[in-house]
Swiss-Prot record:
Enzyme Commission number, as recorded: 4.2.1.10
Family listed: Belongs to the type-II 3-dehydroquinase family.
Pfam families reported for this sequence: DHquinase_II
Function description: Catalyzes a trans-dehydration via an enolate intermediate.
GO terms of biological process kind: amino acid biosynthetic process; aromatic amino acid family biosynthetic process; chorismate biosynthetic process; quinate catabolic process
PROSITE patterns: DEHYDROQUINASE_II (PS01029)
Lineage: Bacteria, Pseudomonadati, Pseudomonadota, Gammaproteobacteria, Moraxellales
Protein name in UniProt: 3-dehydroquinate dehydratase
Length: 151
């Protein structure tokens, strides 16, 4: 396995499966991560996952990705989407392409969730498709970093 993709999960995503399942679904974060790792392995891609409820820890993990040769980041910034200039600056600072993913359709929710500090810099945004959004993002990421991959 050569290329690496990093999946970052933001605050409260450790509660998936328990927190508001009518909004976020019934799968746990562990279920989602296992599915993504299996999907990446089929394409001979190394996939790392990271979750934190702390903005600074997520910023540190993004910085670390640059030294690890990560080719693409899939990020669900959760509530930090709407508040974190630090997260935006970290992603721009490492210059690793990223895809923004949200389980729920943030545009169909409260007005404060409609703004993202990341979307205008992301290569793509997927929202409202539940856990399947991560899988779609990973499909695209694999294609992006391995254009000749037949999968």
């Amino acid at each position: 396995m050569s290329s690496t993709i990093l999946v970052i999960h933001g605050p409260n995503l450790n509660l998936l499966g328990k927190r508001e399942p009518e909004v976020y679904g019934h799968l746990t974060l562990d279920n989602i991560n296992r599915q993504l790792i299996a999907q990446a392995e089929q394409a001979s891609i190394t996939l790392d996952t990271f979750q934190s409820n702390w903005e600074g820890a997520i910023v540190d993990r993004i910085h670390q990705a640059q030294t690890e040769g990560v080719k693409l980041i899939i990020i669900n910034p959760a509530a930090l989407t709407h508040t974190s200039v630090a997260l935006r600056d970290a992603l721009l600072g490492v210059a690793i392409p990223f895809i923004e993913v949200h389980l729920s359709n943030v545009h169909a929710r409260e007005a404060f969730r409609h703004h993202s500090y990341l979307s205008d810099k992301a290569i793509g945004v997927i929202c409202g498709l539940g856990a399947k959004g991560y899988s779609f993002a990973l499909d695209y990421a694999i294609e992006k970093i391995q254009p000749s991959n037949p999968n």
